[in-house]
């Protein structure tokens, strides 16, 4: 048992996050995303939505402050400017964790799949809101 560690953060997940370096990507993806296709480790957060996962992850995971866009979201096909409730929850968690407004960039769905190829690891949530897939670039502490 550890003090001051979010209860969703398991030992294997903390180990993965610790091994990530500055600039590495973490995928925070919904239940429909084909995370296992990429060959990166996949941490199962079934039953956890995007907001809950973001609150846990961002309690220990610094976002990159040296780039304009440390978070990318998958666009909704045919409605690229639409912001889902899941994205709103991620935005709230990111802003709170970083103590500043965090810009979430929009990426077309197929471009997002390509952008996810070098991901270090995925956190596969049980999020039911479609297109709730995000890439988070790790910063420094």
Predicted features along the sequence, with ranges:
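Catalytic cores of large soluble enzymes that bind and process phosphate-bearing ligands
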Residues: 1, 5, 45-49, 78-82, ...
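A phosphate-binding glycine/aspartate-rich beta-alpha loop in the early core of alpha/beta enzymes
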Residues: 39-71
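Conserved phosphate- and dinucleotide-binding cores of soluble alpha/beta proteins
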Residues: 4, 64-66, 136-141
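Long, hydrophobic N-terminal alpha-helical segment
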Residues: 1-46
